[in-house]
Amino acid sequence: MIIHSIFLLMVSITLVIAEESDNVLFDKRAPTGHQEMQGKQNSASLNSENFGIFKRALMGFQGVRGKKNSIINDVKNELFPEDINKRAPMGFQGMRGKKASFDDEYYKRAPMGFQGMRGKKSLEEILDEIKKKTTRFQDSRSKDVYLIDYPEDYGKRVLSMDGYQNILDKKDELLGEWEKRAPMGFYGTRGKKIILDALEELDKRGVMDFQIGLQRKKDTTFDDYLDYAINPFDYEKRSTDFQDVESGSESFKRARMGFHGMRGKRDAAGIYGSNSSTVGTIFGYQDMRNRGNNFPVYQVEKRSPFRYLGARGKKNPRWEFRGKFVGVRGKKSSLQTVF
């Protein structure tokens, strides 16, 4: 009987010790997750009275983010309006945050493009630019001159063209279409396309067309000539340097200068007529043997040394005497070794 009672006492003591050991293990270990980062969740925090205040994040870094204090939020909501102090859900509060209500009106921007900086061009400015561009030419001093600056002489002639009349007649219609554009992009620079269609013909016209109208037709007969006197004896000769080409000699395999074997020389009498005369003007030079030679110089009618025939006279024929080409492309001058 005594042994049986002792055995029951030992079993009961063992059960009590086992229950206490289970409670110790439950207090030392967290149910899930890393113990160092989140630790054990206190069972007291699951109480319904403290649930809203002491509830911690189940995962992540508790010390970094954690739970916001509801008391502080309540105080903020009471002291400050919600629409002003409401923060962005993510990002940096100081950089992004909520803008004040008056910022939208104070810092109001244009919808698109640099509307405030560049603005819209008026139709009159565009027409003036096109007129200046298409009525520009250069005078004898390479200075730009615009026809619209001289309306009494040239303005009527240029502005009577079909292109300008078409624009001036439709000015009111184009201006109405110009004002209907939506405020987007660089609309001040580009403008409405209907205006570009109307001005396309004027934009494609060359500047030289107005030079022909002002200064008459350009004389292109003697464009490649030089203002030098010529020797008539050289024009009576023809090129005979290619007579031995078929013989295969080394000296006749290539033309010496220009097309002198194919075209030869021009006849001076055929160019200037039979009325031209040789006068007593003497042009002297010395050859390789230092023998003086004098040749009469073929004189031509004096003309204005400008290019335009009608307005400024006809240009002198440029026959070269000192260079390698005596004529246009003719025979090589025998006098080139002296000069």
Curated annotation (Swiss-Prot):
The keyword Endoplasmic reticulum does not apply. The modification Glutamine amide is found at Q38. The modification Arginine amide is found at R65, R96, R118, R190, R263, R312, R329. It comes from the Eukaryota. Keywords: Amidation, Behavior, Cleavage on pair of basic residues, Neuropeptide, Neurotransmitter, Secreted, Signal. The modification Tyrosine amide is found at Y154. It is found in: Secreted. The keyword Signal applies. Residues 19-27, 41-54, 219-252, 267-301, 333-339 form a propeptide. Strong expression was detected in the queen and forager heads, while weak and almost no significant expression was detected in the nurse and drone heads, respectively. One of its GO terms (cellular component) is extracellular region. GO terms for biological process: chemical synaptic transmission; neuropeptide signaling pathway. Residues 1-18 form the signal peptide. Belongs to the tachykinin family. Tachykinins are active peptides which excite neurons, evoke behavioral responses, are potent vasodilators and secretagogues, and contract (directly or indirectly) many smooth muscles. Associated with sex-specific or age/division of labor-selective behavior and/or physiology of honeybees. This is Tachykinins. The lineage of its organism: Eukaryota, Metazoa, Ecdysozoa, Arthropoda, Hexapoda.
